[in-house]
């Protein structure tokens, strides 16, 4: 496996840290008045999702993670597992509920998403940045209720709850940002 020196660190680089694959979120080079230069690195553990900060002296190396990111199409959910397919090779992947995390609230059949594989096992699913979902349940908007800039909660067809403007009704299709869980606009 490839080893990376501290001076090769950049955001997005995948490394093995404490036995788990991690991605560099932020790399800060610190040059104190006295002493040796060091790097303060913020990592995101790709398995647990936790963020941790470590410092490294110049000259240290870390092993690169054998991580692949594939663009897969979501096929269906059978209750316990989620099924995806690579459109190039037609290879299918089965992912359990625990690995899906928050992504399951944003995926509609036939959507494309990014699946991260480590040692040929799926470890995370990243939905597209924006998805179009249908409103299944929400309170009716009251005419003339425009005093505030507030919204109302709406349950989407995937089960996720999103704050939407007062004019959105049941059956409407809305665009949702999956990174922030915010309403973007009508679809």
UniProtKB/Swiss-Prot annotation:
SMART domains: EFP, Elong-fact-P_C. It comes from Ruthia magnifica subsp. Calyptogena magnifica. This is Elongation factor P. May be beta-lysylated on the epsilon-amino group of Lys-34 by the combined action of EpmA and EpmB, and then hydroxylated on the C5 position of the same residue by EpmC (if this protein is present). Lysylation is critical for the stimulatory effect of EF-P on peptide-bond formation. The lysylation moiety may extend toward the peptidyltransferase center and stabilize the terminal 3-CCA end of the tRNA. Hydroxylation of the C5 position on Lys-34 may allow additional potential stabilizing hydrogen-bond interactions with the P-tRNA. Pfam families: EFP (PF01132), EFP_N (PF08207), Elong-fact-P_C (PF09285). NCBIfam families: efp (TIGR00038), PRK00529.1 (NF001810). The keyword Iron does not apply. The modification N6-(3,6-diaminohexanoyl)-5-hydroxylysine is found at residue 34.
């Amino acid at each position: 496996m490839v080893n990376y020196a501290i001076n090769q660190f950049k955001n997005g680089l995948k490394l093995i840290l404490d036995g788990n694959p991690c991605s560099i979120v932020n790399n800060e080079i610190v040059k104190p008045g006295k002493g040796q230069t060091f790097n303060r690195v913020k990592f995101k553990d790709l398995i647990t999702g936790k963020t941790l900060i470590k410092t490294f002296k110049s000259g240290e190396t870390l092993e690169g993670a054998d991580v692949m990111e594939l663009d897969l199409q979501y096929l269906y959910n059978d209750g316990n597992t989620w099924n995806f397919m690579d459109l190039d090779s037609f290879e299918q992947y089965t992912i359990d509920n625990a690995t899906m995390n928050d992504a399951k609230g944003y995926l509609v059949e036939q959507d494309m998403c990014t699946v991260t594989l480590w040692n040929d096992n799926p470890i995370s699913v990243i939905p597209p940045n924006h998805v179009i979902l249908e409103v299944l349940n929400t309170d009716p908007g009251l005419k003339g209720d425009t005093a505030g800039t507030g919204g109302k909660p709406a349950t989407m067809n995937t089960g996720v709850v999103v704050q939407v403007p007062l004019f959105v009704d049941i059956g409407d299709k809305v665009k949702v940002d999956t990174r922030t869980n915010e309403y973007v606009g009508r679809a």
